[in-house]
Amino acid sequence: MTMLKDPSKKYRAFPTIELPDRTWPSKTITEAPIWCSSDLRDGNQSLIEPMDSEKKLRFWKTLVQVGVKEIEASFPSASQTDFDFVRTLIEDGHIPDDTTIQVLTQAREDLIARTFESLRGAKKAIVHLYNATSPSFRRIVFNQDKQGVKDIAVNAAKLFVKYAAQQPETQWTFQYSPETFSATELEFAKEVCDAVIEVWNPTPEHKVILNLPATVEVATPNIYADQIEWFCRNISRRDSVIISLHCHNDRGTGIAATELGLMAGADRAEGCLFGNGERTGNVDLVTLALNLYTQGIDPQLDFSDIDGVRKVVEECNQLPVHPRHPYVGDLVHTAFSGSHQDAIRKGFAKQQDGELWEVPYLPIDPADIGRSYEAVIRVNSQSGKGGITYLLEQEYGISLPRRMQIEFSQVVQGETDRLGLEMTAQQIYSLLHKEYLQANSPYALVSHRLQEENGHSAVEVEVAGEGETTLHWRGKGNGALEALVAGLPIAVEIMDYNEHAIGAGTNAKAAAYIELRVAGGRPVHGVGIDENITTASFKALFSALNRSLSQQEAKAA
């Protein structure tokens, strides 16, 4: 089957909204919305392998640290795992006083009862009700008319009131989503929401949340903005309602739709870090927040250590962040083009502390989000007749990880500037060997002994220190590297680890690469090569540790 010559025979354009006096095009966003993360619910349910409780708790703590104040934690009636996770958050005191847990439920009494039970003992909570309202869902999925769909929402809303009254110690906030709102007739969406509002009887002091999802993107962002503005104008008790957005990215315009929706009068935005979620993902809260930041607006979220946040998200979701993802990708602050490099260099030369940021090609100062300037101006691979990475792979079988390519290119650039000549593959390898493989000071690995028992590792290393001293470090952990890290006298964090074989057969060696952060400093890479993969990984860690300490010493001097 091929694409149709006349797609109008199969697809139709979404109708425009009759709103000739729309005001949102002349509006600007002047403050951050209320943020709600759906990573642990919408994001988690879309993963090939959903997070276990340990990963979910790690993710929760990261969201709290970033500053998200409303977090949709689970679908507690869907599984015992989700129910138990909510109980863990409440019973073990993981919910700060300024943070509200949110949970989702369908419109059935047994599921609603189970959901409220999961929240017993919570100081405050948002309970989120939804049912689909669009024509296709009414006709194809549920075989219900408009009245039937409305009755489902109203009856469930009454059950919310009933079960909340049984737990008066909790400060309840009710949220309703007419799922598939953006594909629903506006008058009907308003009718259903008005009926739910009538049951819940909100006040300006105790508001309800109406969440208006673009469950599937069906039109351009301006149409979604028209829908939001029309809804904000016409919904009853607007002063007692928080209008929330929940955009997906099926057409690639989730960010734009959310921003225009905020201009149209919405108060709140739901999404996921780096855009995880069903199909093409939920709107990316990080991009939304940093878009505000680069317009001079405090986003009320802290991404000062964006690489640390990314590390948690990648490990919990088991999905990589694209190298060209806005703000956080490995390549977004990197210029390969000579003209781009020249403009950036001139921008840095003129940029003064305290002045408005005006460096060409860089919409944000990388330092604001914990990035260094070293990756910004980078050697163009084509100028090296194949590039640094290509030469190392082809001539020596060494495949540098992406972020290490960026770091090492700066080392090569410094050498080419010093020599004023093009470097050969042998010269590049010699520089790699000197910079990484010979990084043996102040600590040189002499030997190590590793013991494995019941899935745990215990390691003892002999280290040659400064002044011909001999040191012995011991540590335990879930693996060899974790055990070694536990035995170090310095606090370090492994940000990334990669390994591969060099060659094949009995003469093969192992190459290991570690990205290490020492005492909260800037991440630094290390390399280890050995016949034994464990030894190679230990050498890589010592390489990174020594390089970091040497750089810190040089900076202090």
UniProtKB/Swiss-Prot annotation:
Stored SMART domains: LeuA_dimer (SM00917)
Catalytic activity: 3-methyl-2-oxobutanoate + acetyl-CoA + H2O = (2S)-2-isopropylmalate + CoA + H(+)
Pyruvate carboxyltransferase domain ranges (all copies): 33-307
Compartments (UniProt record): Cytoplasm
Predominant subcellular localization, coarse grouping: cytoplasm
This protein's UniProt keywords: Amino-acid biosynthesis, Branched-chain amino acid biosynthesis, Cytoplasm, Leucine biosynthesis, Magnesium, Metal-binding, Transferase
GO molecular function: 2-isopropylmalate synthase activity; acetyl-CoA C-acetyltransferase activity; magnesium ion binding
Cofactor dependence: Mg(2+)
Pathway recorded for this protein: Amino-acid biosynthesis; L-leucine biosynthesis; L-leucine from 3-methyl-2-oxobutanoate: step 1/4
EC number: 2.3.3.13
Keyword Membrane listed: no
GO biological process: L-leucine biosynthetic process
Record family assignment: Belongs to the alpha-IPM synthase/homocitrate synthase family. LeuA type 2 subfamily.
General function of this protein: Catalyzes the condensation of the acetyl group of acetyl-CoA with 3-methyl-2-oxobutanoate (2-ketoisovalerate) to form 3-carboxy-3-hydroxy-4-methylpentanoate (2-isopropylmalate).
PANTHER family: 2-ISOPROPYLMALATE SYNTHASE (PTHR46911:SF1), PTHR46911
Protein name: 2-isopropylmalate synthase
Source species of the chain: Pseudomonas putida (strain W619)
Encoding gene (name): leuA
